[in-house]
A protein has these predicted regions:
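A conserved beta-strand-loop-helix scaffold within acyl/acetyltransferase catalytic domains
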Residues: 1-62, 105-267, 357
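Membrane-proximal basic amphipathic "stem/tether" segments
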Residues: 319-358
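Short helix-loop capping/hinge motifs at secondary-structure junctions, enriched
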Residues: 79-81, 143-145, 322-324
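Acyl-donor binding region in acyl/amide transferases
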Residues: 25-29, 49-131, 248-317
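Residue-level detector of flexible, active-site-proximal loop/helix-junction positions
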Residues: 134, 182, 298, 319-322
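Short beta-strand-to-coil "C-cap" segments at the C-terminal boundary of structured domains/repeats
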Residues: 139-140, 317-321
């Protein structure tokens, strides 16, 4: 929800009406009478029905395939009072918003979730947690050599070293990191071209295949680069980009946001080789203590390279003590919808496998 990342996507990534919840001070400038209060909380959200569109409406913190986290931005100072104010304000009858809040894809052990839960419990508000999955993460407390020695078997380490050596025999193989705004701008265009040449381009799911997604990605990444909050890692072969990885950084944390590789070289696993180099960089960077893969729980590459996981869950909060039934129903609808989607995906994948065999 970093403003430089989220705001470019509000009107470009979702057909729904995405609104912006802000809590700020009401201090005024005596000369201009303009409100100059600091923002204490920011959260994009949608108003919708949970799961299969059954039951009362909910306030859902906005998540999307390009922002898989529903944690609102909360000012650390007086954070408990801020959340208490949010709950009590939404509970007012004069506020024309649903009275059930849903925070999807939030770390169950994170400080924000602990805060949201503790304030709710302290006020006797009903809560539920559902749709818990494990996401690959990286705790950067080891050096890279020790980490890979423990994370990968000797067979896999030798295999990846062999692939890197064989790829280097085809030309001048280089690992590069774009960090300055100008370098990031150029590397971003190379990423978009590389991703669009692969299967995502064929299925029209690449960033560049949709002008709104492309505009969002360019603006968001270039905005972050202006504040030194973006790195684009790349493998190049004779000067041509064959794998690219966009990493977002904030304070001492990193997110491996998007990756693409040259599918004509898939036998060398350039995407995996790049992720290994990027992992080494993250582990050896004293300014990074934690990295989020932003990956699905069963991601074939990240679950192998990053052996640690973090529980990601959906937190449901009712802003009135009498809403326990509504909270329970919303949580069960969300869980049922998730299970049904996963089952449909498994069936679709099996059908595709059967068709390919024929």
């Amino acid at each position: 929800f970093s403003p430089r990342f989220a705001i470019p996507g509000l009107s470009r990534l979702d057909d729904r009406d995405v609104r912006l919840m802000l809590l700020h001070d009401q201090a005024t400038d005596s000369e201009s009478d303009q409100r100059v209060g600091d923002v204490r909380l920011m959260m994009p959200f949608t108003v919708e029905k949970p799961g299969f569109s059954v039951g009362p409406n909910i306030i859902r913190a906005w998540v999307n395939p390009y922002g898989p986290s529903g944690v609102p931005i909360i000012e650390r100072r007086e954070a408990h009072q801020i959340i208490d104010d949010v709950y009590s304000t939404i509970a007012l009858g004069c506020v024309a918003l649903p009275k059930v809040l849903v925070f999807p894809d939030v770390p169950s052990d994170g400080p924000a979730v602990s805060l949201l839960r503790s304030v709710a419990i302290g006020n006797g508000l009903p809560i539920a947690m559902t749709q818990t999955v494990k996401r690959p993460v990286l705790n950067a407390w080891q050096d890279s050599e020790m980490y890979f020695h423990e994370a990968l078997s000797g067979h896999h380490r030798r295999n990846y070293n062999r692939l890197f050596r064989q790829l280097g025999e085809r030309g001048d193989l280089q690992y590069q990191i774009a960090r300055s705004p100008d370098d990031v701008r150029l590397a971003m265009e190379e990423f978009l071209l590389l991703e669009n040449r692969g299967w995502k381009g064929e299925k029209r799911s690449s960033l560049a295949s949709d002008r709104y997604r492309g505009a969002f990605a360019r603006e968001a990444i270039n905005n972050l680069a202006q504040q030194d909050k973006c790195r684009i890692h790349a493998l190049t072969l004779d000067g041509d980009v064959i794998a690219s990885l966009i990493v977002l950084v904030e304070a001492n944390r990193a997110w491996t946001w998007k990756t693409a590789y040259d599918e004509s070289l898939r036998q060398f696993s350039p995407g995996t080789l790049l992720m290994m180099r990027a992992t080494e960089t993250l582990l050896d960077d004293p300014n990074v203590v934690f990295a989020d893969s932003c990956a699905l729980p069963d991601h074939p590459v990240m679950t192998r390279l990053w052996t640690e996981t973090r529980d990601m869950t959906t937190l449901v909060v009712g802003v009135d003590p009498q809403l326990e039934t509504e909270v329970r129903k919303a949580a069960s609808q969300i869980e049922l919808y998730s299970q049904t989607r996963n089952l449909a995906k498994q069936m679709r994948d099996r059908l595709r496998t059967m068709v390919k065999r024929r």
